[in-house]
Amino acid sequence: TSAFMQAFTHNPTEPVYDDSDPDAGGYSRIKAMEYYNPVAIINERNMESKNDNYGANIRATLNILPIKGLKWENFVSYDKEQYETREYYTHYYPSLIGTNGQAYIENYQENDTQYESTLNYSNIFGKHSIQALLGYTYQYTYSTSASMTNSGFDFDDNQTHYIGTGTNLTEGKASMSSNKEDNTYIGFFGRFMYNYDDKYLLSASLRRDGSSRFGDNN
């Protein structure tokens, strides 16, 4: 529920507070309309999020002697992302009045590993120029997530820190979910280029990719 949209569409002369309605926490509300007090939307919820990202990569090149023009290049990278989201809506959050507070927690983590290796050859023999490339690439991604929503708290002080104390859990009404996903990608590729006297050019390339996302035999 957007506080901005509620403020934009509501009668500006409507009071913000109404002490005669304790169920709404002293906020003004119109029960017959799908209108939610924008001030209550802002004040009666707490949203926290934490996001951490880590990454590292290494690149190395080796000249392979005694073959002139032949190089072996390798690249390795690792990235990790994780975040946690916590949301709490008090007893007086407009669209949830009667649920006695609602808490939500979500955790997500993803790890991504990549490796690429290539052999590069480049040389000139008189009027002849040759360039060749052979490569291999690998990527593995692994992610997990979990979330939980619970309602029915005696008071709002604990927010999301004791999410298991809500009565919806004991009544079998709380929602929980978790997920795990991992994907692997592998690719082989090559390219060959021949140039004669900067007049004639011959080129060829190939590539073969496979991924766990593609299904069997791919």
Predicted regions mapped to residue ranges:
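Residue-level signature of outer-membrane beta-barrel architecture
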Residues: 60-64, 121-123, 194-196, 204
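Repeated loop/turn-to-beta-strand initiation elements of outer-membrane beta-barrel proteins
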Residues: 66-70, 127-130, 200-202
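Short glycine/threonine-rich loop-to-helix capping motif typified by GTGT followed
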Residues: 216-218
